[in-house]
Amino acid sequence: MSEESFLPEEFQQIVHRFERMMRENQSYYFDREELEDLIFYYSDQFLFSQALSVVEHAKNLFQEHSSILLREAEIYTSMGQLHKSIGLLKKISPLQEHHLDWLMANAVAYSQLHEHDKAIGFLEQAMEISEPENVDDIALEL
C-alpha cells in the first residue's frame, strides 16, 4: 500500500496538483500552509529534492517568508548540509528568536556539528518558552 493511500483525499489532490505543475513546468498558486504541508510530506519521506522544489516555489510566491526559510533550513539539516542550514537560520533569527521551531532547528543543527554547548543553549531557551506539556519532550533532547 502506498504512502499516499493514507493521506486525506484533499491533501492527495494538493500533492497531485503540485506534481502535475512540476511535470508540466507550470506555475500554480498554493497558499503558504499548503506549501508547508507539502514540504513536510516530502521531507517525511526523505524526498529532499522534491521538498526543496516546494521551497523554491514557495519562495517565488511568498518571497523569503521566515517560515519557508525555516523549513528550508530543516531540510538542509536533514541532508547534512549543516552550514547552509545555520546560514538560513541566522538570516531569519531576528524574526524567530522566540519561536520554538527556530530554536529546535538550531539545536539540531548545532548538535550535528558537535557544537553541543550551543545546542544545549538553544534547547534551554526552547524549554523556557515552551508550553508546560512540551518541556519533557525538549528535555529528552538534552
Regions found by a protein language model. Name each.
Residues 37-38, 72, 106, 142:
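Structural register within alpha-helical repeat arrays
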Residues 63, 97, 131-133:
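Short coil turns that delineate tetratricopeptide repeat
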